[in-house]
Each structure stands twice: as C-alpha cells, then as structure tokens.
Amino acid sequence: MQERVVNFYSEGSKLEADYFLPDDYTEGERRPGIVLCHGYSGVRTVILPDYAEYFVAAGYPVLSFDYRGFGGSEGTKWRIIADEQLQDIRNAVTWLEAQPEVDPERLGIWGTSNGGA
C-alpha cells in the first residue's frame, strides 16, 4: 500500500489528509475511489487507517481526512458544525475525483460513527 500526506482547502482552511493507493495500481488506470470520514470528535489517524487498509487491499484509492479544526487541519480546534463538516466532505470528494488514479464517476463515501451519518 502506498501512502502519502496531502492537503486540500475547504472554505479557506487547509485540511490534512492521507491518500492511499493499492500497490498493484498501474499508471493511467482509473479506479473507483473512497473518501473516509472520521466520527464526531475523532481524527483520521485513529481507527480509519485499518479501514483504509481494507479498502486499498480491495483495490480502491482512498482519501482519509481531518475535518477543519481536527487533527492536522486548520480551523478552530474541536468546533463541530455539521454544515462545515459537510462542506469539508464535499471538498474531499472534489479533491479525490481530480486525482488521475480515480474514476470521478465511481466514488464512495464511508465513515465511522457521526462520519457515517
């Protein structure tokens, strides 16, 4: 599994994320992608790496990110506003669908706890 830390912007805040690719990925290929969302007051580095490993082993590119104000992302720390988190998810999807490894017509969103609601 290939992994790298990436950043993207959501409404002016820089969000931090992990981007995972399967080891068997072939350049030029476009695969379905998955965005992983952490729960209510979680961070991307707890629990989500296990799920990322599962999805990547199944062949999916995966983006796991911290909402603004959580983990390595900018923003007011630990502030939870559902509308802002929805904007962050939309911007995570936009980032993922722009990656050359990902088929933008085949995307999924998966989350734990409140991240899956």
Locations of the language-model features?
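N-terminal cap/lid segment of alpha/beta-hydrolase-fold proteins
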Residues: 1-32
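Alpha/beta-hydrolase fold nucleophile elbow
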Residues: 101-113
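Short glycine-enriched nucleophile-adjacent loop
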Residues: 116-117
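Catalytic nucleophile-loop/oxyanion-hole region of alpha/beta-hydrolase
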Residues: 43-47, 70-104
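Conserved dinucleotide-binding and phosphotransfer motif residues
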Residues: 11, 58, 99
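The serine-hydrolase catalytic nucleophile loop
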Residues: 40-53, 67
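Conserved alpha/beta-hydrolase
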Residues: 54-74
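Active-site glycine-rich loops that stabilize anionic/oxyanionic intermediates
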Residues: 11, 31, 36-43, 113
